[in-house]
Amino acid sequence: SETDSRKEGRMGQKNAVIRQWCENDCNYAPK
């Protein structure tokens, strides 16, 4: 659904930020 697509988009953005954090502290990296 459209709502699911938006939700996945936000998760994608969050995961991209977490991957950036991983350069400093990989405890934040998604498992």
Curated annotation (Swiss-Prot):
User: What are the annotated GO cellular component locations?
Assistant: extracellular region
Tell me the first and last residues of the signal peptide. none
Single GO molecular function: toxin activity
- Tissue-specific expression: Expressed by the venom gland.
Q: Has UniProt tagged this entry with the keyword Secreted?
A: yes
Modification(s) after translation:
Contains one or more disulfide bonds.
Q: Which UniProt keywords apply?
A: Disulfide bond, Neurotoxin, Secreted, Toxin
Q: Does the keyword Iron-sulfur apply?
A: no
- Where is this protein found? Secreted
Principal subcellular localisation of the protein? secreted
State the family named in the UniProt similarity comment for this chain.
Belongs to the scolopendra toxin 1 family.
The protein here is known as Scolopendra 4610.56 Da toxin
